[in-house]
């Protein structure tokens, strides 16, 4: 049994309280609670909810509205499914919304689904199958593909279906760079998520990476080699991604490598090298985003930045950027 006393906690302002149950009993046949933070997503929330409710192993879907001014709330209220719960969290941010939903979740497992994405058929079943084969795992994860605003597939990540990602003790690999890029591809054990304090609300970006690292510090991960999620690229989220720079991610790097729980579990003397690897990973990610949006001058600047940090890392970063250009 994992308790909050077993780990070093976040500050009180960021900490997730123990579960506060809604009047919905836990269902052993449907052990997953889906938490959806939502703000002005009327165009997509119906499709997102339908994809979650189509998963028979989902016992509840908790939508946390974060101050929507469009018809998001009305669309959620119109759905006649007893598994849907609506909460409000006035413009406190996505991390606070997720934490609030997690606090009130009754499921053994949590899945954090963005309100404009959609789960693929059988996604939750695939994750639970992997979980049964990994009883010590605190997080089970798979992979995703990308779709456009109309739901048409634009990514080609299916070409990588033979690729394996880390399982077991993944902390060292994860500290070097986030390979779980969307919460919709992962099940987090609710007890463990609450024990590590949930998402740090002080971080604007990469708060998920920090949380996954804390989870990896207390338990194992298991990879399920399936495409589980359609990650939607549309005007709002691509405009946001297009203006991010590597500097936007540095607070998360500092937080990860100043976290006592994480540092205590890293191999002695490894933190400096892993921090440098994480910085290179995030600059590479910035270059991948830039190439997707046709900002080729920024691509060259970011690759030059990587070369100055580590010439050995440059070829791999160039390959990743080239693959991103073709939706991989």
Model feature map: region roles:
Residues 1-26, 233-328:
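C-terminal subregions of glycosyltransferases and related glycan-biosynthesis enzymes
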């Amino acid at each position: 049994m994992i308790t909050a006393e077993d780990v070093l906690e976040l500050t009180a302002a960021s900490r997730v309280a123990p579960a506060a149950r809604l009047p919905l009993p836990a269902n052993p046949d449907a052990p997953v609670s889906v938490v959806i933070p939502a703000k002005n997503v009327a165009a997509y929330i119906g499709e997102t909810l339908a994809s979650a409710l189509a998963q028979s192993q989902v016992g509840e879907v908790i939508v946390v509205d974060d101050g929507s001014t469009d018809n998001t709330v009305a669309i959620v209220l119109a759905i006649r499914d007893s598994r849907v719960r609506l909460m409000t969290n006035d413009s406190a941010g996505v991390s606070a919304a997720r934490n609030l939903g997690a606090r009130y979740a009754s499921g053994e497992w949590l899945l954090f689904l963005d309100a404009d994405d959609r789960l693929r058929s059988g996604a939750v079943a695939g994750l639970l199958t992997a979980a049964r084969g990994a009883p010590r795992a605190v997080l089970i994860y798979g992979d995703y593909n990308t779709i456009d605003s109309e739901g048409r597939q634009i990514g080609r990540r299916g070409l990588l279906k033979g690729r394996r990602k880390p399982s077991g003790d993944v902390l060292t690999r994860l500290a070097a760079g986030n390979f779980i890029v969307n919460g919709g591809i992962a099940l987090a054990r609710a007890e463990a998520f609450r024990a590590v304090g949930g998402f740090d609300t002080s971080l604007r970006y990469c708060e998920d990476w920090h949380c996954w690292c804390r989870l990896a510090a207390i338990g194992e991960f298991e990879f399920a080699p399936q495409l589980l999620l359609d990650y939607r690229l549309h005007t709002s989220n691509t405009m946001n991604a297009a203006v991010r720079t590597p500097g936007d991610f540095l607070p998360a790097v500092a937080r990860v490598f100043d976290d006592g729980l994480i540092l205590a579990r890293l191999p002695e003397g490894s933190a400096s090298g892993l921090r440098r690897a994480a910085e290179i990973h995030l600059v590479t990610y910035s270059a991948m985003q830039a190439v997707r949006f046709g900002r080729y001058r920024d691509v060259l600047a970011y690759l030059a930045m990587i070369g100055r940090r580590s010439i050995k890392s440059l070829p791999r970063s160039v390959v990743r950027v080239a693959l991103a250009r073709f939706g991989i």
